[in-house]
Amino acid sequence: MTNLSERILAFERKLQVHMHEVFCPTHLSIGQEHVAEEMAAEMIKEDWLFSTHRNHHHYLAKGGDEQKLWDEIMGLESGLNGGFAGSQGITDRSINFHASAIVGGLIGVAAGAAFSLRNSKSNAISISCIGDAASEQGVFWEVLNFAVLYNLPLCIIMENNGKSVDAHISERQVGEISPKVAAFGVKTFQSIGEAIRFTRDNRLPSFVEVKVKLKCAHLNMATMLDLCDQSEPTS
């Protein structure tokens, strides 16, 4: 485990301990630190990174401010967005980082950023981090078509934990995701580093599906703990 992975794990474990102080929906990334590690090894500051509701590891991988992230989750004015965004919607323009609570909500925005970079002299690319459930949104497939049609420097990183909340992927989808993506003409990879390098070097879209195992609850927040404590008796 590298220093970055250790930092991320320590941050998330600390949040678990202080979860009774958190009053915004919070999705921890315990078990997915290696994804951030691989991303950090290839990203440059100029890259645009679009994340999900489970974004802490992505943000720290991009070089984000750990203390400001903590303050934001705690709802403090000193947070990244003044305490108004909470965990799910953090934005840090200084490092081109954006997150959204909506499943698949930023894939189209990531494609737009890639479109703006298409004819740029910059070496930057657009990176969209998503979960497997995002592939159940129509915009995901529309973006694949658009990215191939216009040769967009867009790298899509899918963290597939096999679940949408508690519904297993076998209950929601038929077949594997990567072959469907490849059918659009998108170059698919098994390594995050290879996918990012391909998009950067060739200015073309890429896709990588990383199988991960989330080692914590889907959602953590103080109000859920309170609900458990105040649950009505069953009889």
Predicted regions and their residues:
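Structural motif
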Residues: 50, 125-130, 155-157, 207-211
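Short, proline-centered helix/strand-breaking motifs
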Residues: 149-158, 185-187
